[in-house]
Amino acid sequence: MDSQKNTNLALQALEVLAQYHNISINPEEIKHKFDIDGHGLNQTKWLLAAKSLGLKVRTANKTVDRLPFLHLPALAWRDDGEHFILLKIDQETDRYLIFDLIQKNPIVLDKNEFEERYQSKVILIASRASIVGNLAKFDFTWFIPAVIKYRKIFIETLIVSIFLQIFALITPLFFQVVMDKVLVHRGFSTLNVITVALAIVVLFEIILGGLRTYVFAHSTSRIDVELGARLFRHLLALPISYFEARRVGDTVARVRELDQIRNFLTGQALTSILDLLFSFIFFAVMWYYSPKLTLVVLGSLPCYVIWSVFISPILRRRLDDKFARNADNQSFLVESVTAINTIKAMAISPQMTNIWDKQLASYVAVSFKVTVLATIGQQGIQLIQKAVMVINLWLGAHLVISGDLSIGQLIAFNMLAGQIISPVIRLAQIWQDFQQVGISVTRLGDVLNSPTENNTASVSLPEIQGEISFRNIKFRYKPDSPMILNNINLDISQGEVIGIVGRSGSGKSTLTKLIQRFYIPEQGQVLIDGHDLALADPNWLRRQVGVVLQDNVLLNRSIRENIALTNPGMPMEKVIAAAKLAGAHDFISELREGYNTVVGEQGAGLSGGQRQRIAIARALVNNPRILIFDEATSALDYESENIIMHNMHKICQNRTVLIIAHRLSTVKNADRIIVMDKGEIIEQGKHQELLKDEKGLYSYLHQLQVN
């Protein structure tokens, strides 16, 4: 391979890795800065170039066996310049997914094939944003700052716990005095004093116990609110790709795992831990009474731990299975309710019921196994507790008979042992709940640890004018999927009306998604007014871009609120003006409550054409500089479509408009028509110009529609 090609591979690797980390890159600028002599990017220059983009990089020499422990993707550097990117390693099958920079495609290699390519040199890459994200990773450590934040409340709880433990220590001593002194000497006056004192202790114990529970619940509720608020904010900030890669029910199931964490935080787990911390005081008093009996109690503690450790892995696997089945049920339920019209129309309720019954039976079976295993765990703990009680009774009775221990001391000892064993038993049982919470934290982590589409490099730019440029765009939704857009180069002038046509799956809608920055291209740049959208704030961009889709979702609010969704305080005059422009004002005025009519869930109270016109009004009300119609009129009746087309000149005035349509009549008056096929632009021009090429795709589509 010649040096020029080697240079290109190193630069291509930097491009791919930068795009992976959502970092904009200009290859020509990199060559200008770091390839001054024209000999290409060697390892040193490559590292400097990567650091200039904000990437954290370091070199390492690693054997093949050590690669699974690295943070991927990473660049495998070769002396001959045939570098490649290591994407993923499947340790079970010894398969290696790499991105071949020569073929420009991901390929899978077995271990022998990989070892032939790999030369033990690897460059580890991470973006600064991802490093910050990892530091803030959601797991059990997330709760530590929250505890520190409310440390005053927790310190107060700790103080209350100390007093509770003192009271718990005093009570057995009272019983010892009664048994050994009062009963023997018939000291009624002493009995009265002890009874009053014990009643006061019990009263304070109840009050302080309730106060501790209240304070703890109050503080954990604050943590719960913070976690819930953070979860929803993060969920809305996730990129479209996150939701497209997951079922709705699966996402809902993960969010509902917050309930498990809430129940755990507000339960007895944390108070039991506090009680256990003071156990050493009880052990000291118990040792004073009887070292032999104390050793029996101490010997039981490892038994609780061993039993819990034995049960936990099995329980965790069952809980994982239970969550997966529950997620399947959630997904199927959401899908069924969403598609209820189709289910009714096709009379497939029996088939759907059959599927639901099978899934439900599977879930119930798994839940039953979890319950059985949890019961076995709890009964095992009870068995250990009863065994300790029997041994202590037998040994204690021997000690009393031999005169080494009084009856009062035996009773007091058993009460103190109960104070130690009780939190241990609770914790052993709570350990099973902890397994469920651990899974819940992991599931929630899938949401909270996923990177949002905003990044630290995002900047708000001046008001959009409307000039759009696509430069050498290549894009696909998944690394192992075919290219959706390939070598797209397109310049759209400010105020130009562009029609985009082509067969289904040709990449028309994907092109507009890049304009909305739903995705970052694998290669190339999308520019608006000369600004790279990879560096732009998505919210700044989308506030100035109006979009009307084929299937628009209306919220369960009034028509006015749906139109003025982005600005609830918008003057009514602007709402009405947008509705008139969209041809919606007349039918809205005929409704009994006019603009205050609640449309129902997803606009169920309106016809398809009415929903579409409200969606168009919603897109127009903010006076966007860029307007995208993605099959926006395909669902309209001819009368509604005629109203929209009649107003199209006003709608397009002083705006850059992109109209995606299958009906060519919708775009024939556009300033320019773009014809796409298989992810490429194959024709462009005005309607009449394109018809002159009788062998062209546009002419072919036009002929089909005419006939």
From Swiss-Prot:
Gene: ltxB
UniProt-listed PROSITE patterns: ABC_TM1F, ABC_TRANSPORTER_1, ABC_TRANSPORTER_2, PEPTIDASE_C39
GO BP term, example: proteolysis
Organism: Aggregatibacter actinomycetemcomitans (Actinobacillus actinomycetemcomitans)
Family affiliation: Belongs to the ABC transporter superfamily. Protein-1 exporter (TC 3.A.1.109) family.
Protein name as it appears in the record: Leukotoxin export ATP-binding protein LtxB
Any one GO molecular-function label of the UniProt entry: peptidase activity
Family matches, as InterPro entries: AAA+_ATPase, ABC1_TM_dom, ABC1_TM_sf, ABC_transporter-like_ATP-bd, ABC_transporter-like_CS, ATPase_T1SS_HlyB, P-loop_NTPase, Peptidase_C39
Pfam families: ABC_membrane, ABC_tran, Peptidase_C39
Compartment annotation: Cell inner membrane
Record note on disruption phenotype: Mutation has no effect on the levels of leukotoxin mRNA, but mutants have significantly less total leukotoxin than the parent strain.
ABC transmembrane type-1 domain location: 158-436
Superkingdom, natural source: Bacteria
Peptidase C39 domain: residues covered: 4-125
Topology within the bilayer: Multi-pass membrane protein
Reactions mediated catalytically: ATP + H2O + proteinSide 1 = ADP + phosphate + proteinSide 2
Organism phylogeny: Bacteria, Pseudomonadati, Pseudomonadota, Gammaproteobacteria, Pasteurellales
Record-annotated ABC transporter domain positions: 468-703
Function (record text): Involved in the export of the LtxA leukotoxin.
A GO-annotated cellular component: type I protein secretion system complex
Induction of its expression: Levels of toxin expression vary greatly among strains. Highly leukotoxic strains (JP2-type strains) produce more LtxA protein and ltx mRNA than minimally leukotoxic strains (652-type strains). Variations are probably due to different types of promoters.
Binding sites annotated in the UniProt record for ATP: G502, R503, S504, G505, S506, G507, K508, S509
Transmembrane segments: 158-178, 191-211, 269-289, 295-315, 387-407
Major enzyme class: translocase
